[in-house]
Design a protein with these regions (language model features):
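Conserved catalytic-core segment of nucleotide-activated headgroup transferases in glycan assembly
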Residues: 185-278
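Conserved acidic donor-binding segment of nucleotide-sugar-dependent glycosyltransferases
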Residues: 324-331, 339-344
Length: 383
């Protein structure tokens, strides 16, 4: 958005629930947008309201994800904006918002093309979550819900003028379901000038392992739990002076219970850079998820040595052994971390290569150029 705002006028329409500070969100978006319209979403993400919405979805043909963003106020807001103002492109950020009528325009004008940003293939992610849920009831509910979401998501893609994805792997998955769909790959990108090694940064302490991400999400919570149970004990046995820092907001009680002499949970931090700068190793032990992980791009931009699972690094054009280390078994993952903790020169070499890859392939300017090229292609072929 920062890059697009330099060359285009942007209008943002967003639903905001109680997990976000509306004023803070508005101020942040205003820096880049001509106009920011926030629509309150009273349908909660947690607690009783979430459970009621899940119950509604049981007796509905609609998925939970769709019900959670079906708002009369959003429909009226979009109708008012699209029918009175002219836009060149309507960019839809998530496919489960595709039920809103985006084919509106001022009288006598042709509606703008609709382009969907598929951060990940949502139904595939929901399918993974359904299989990972422990109880039979949750698995049955998840199995029904992801199939509803698949129908809704594919319908949104079919109705759009184009879909862009974060990785070639996701693009191929989607084209397998919808051959002939107009797609493009726009990689997840980081501000490589913001995330960069700085002379003022403290040097890595040589013993700190870092994981970061929003801890309320299923992939992050599962990854941290998996690492704590299966990998961290193997690291601590070899390096008893090592510490593990878990950075991210909204941890569950079970994750908070991990805190101890060697394990720190920081909660949300406003600036990741000092924490990443002090890390000897960044770990991405993910077993669930889709798209590409921005956390890897940010850590690469900071010149960090990373150990990841294959899934965690999916979609990143990195070579294991050069730009990061990839291991899928607990013993191999722990051994990779131990080698980096014991070999700072190896960690430095991998970190330097990772930084170069981030600058060359995953900077904001390159991603913005790829997206603008896709926009131009769609506009040139529009009737």
């Amino acid at each position: 958005m920062t890059q697009l705002a330099r060359r285009h006028d942007l209008t943002a329409v967003m639903a905001v629930d109680n997990a976000f500070d509306a004023d803070e969100c508005h101020c942040a978006m205003q820096a880049y947008c001509r106009e920011v319209v926030l629509v309150p979403n009273p349908l909660g993400r947690e607690g009783v309201t979430k459970r009621l919405l899940q119950f509604r979805s049981l007796v509905s043909i609609r998925s939970f994800e769709r019900l959670r963003v079906t708002l009369g106020a959003m429909r009226h807001t979009l109708d008012a904006i699209l029918s009175t103002r002219r836009f060149d492109i309507v960019n839809l950020e998530f496919p489960y918002l595709g039920h809103y009528n985006l084919r509106r325009a001022p009288y006598g004008r042709t509606p703008a093309p609709v382009v969907v940003d598929s951060h990940e293939i949502a139904f595939d992610l929901a399918r993974q979550f359904a299989g990972a849920n422990g109880g039979l009831g949750r698995r049955l509910y998840g199995g029904v819900n992801w199939r509803k979401l698949r129908r809704e998501e594919l319908r949104t893609y079919l109705g759009a003028d184009g879909v862009y994805l974060c990785s070639t792997a996701d693009e191929q998955r989607l084209l397998g379901a919808l051959p002939g769909l107009r797609t493009a790959v726009v990689p997840n990108a980081a501000d490589v000038e913001y995330y960069r090694p700085r002379p003022t940064d403290p040097p890595p302490d040589g013993r700190t392992v870092v994981y970061f991400g929003l801890l309320s999400t299923i992939p992050n919570a599962d990854g941290v739990t998996y690492f704590a149970q299966n990998i961290w004990p193997r690291i601590a046995a070899v390096h008893p002076d090592a510490s593990w820092k878990i950075i991210g907001g909204r941890p569950s009680p079970s994750l908070l219970a991990l805190a101890g002499p060697q394990i720190e949970l920081t909660g949300f931090v406003s600036d990741l850079r000092p924490h990443l700068a002090s890390a000897a190793v960044v770990v991405v032990p993910l077993r669930l998820g889709g798209g590409t992980r921005l956390k890897i791009v940010e850590a690469m931009a900071m010149g960090k040595a990373i150990v990841s699972t294959t899934l965690g690094a999916e979609g990143i054009e990195a070579v294991s052994g050069r730009d990061l280390l990839i291991e899928d078994e607990p013993a191999g993952f722990a051994d990779a971390v131990n080698r980096l903790l014991a070999g700072p020169s190896l960690a430095a070499r991998i970190g330097q290569s990772a930084r170069q890859l981030a600058v060359n392939r995953y900077g904001w300017s390159g991603a913005a150029e790829a997206l603008e090229g896709f926009y131009r292609q769609i506009l040139e072929e529009a009737p």
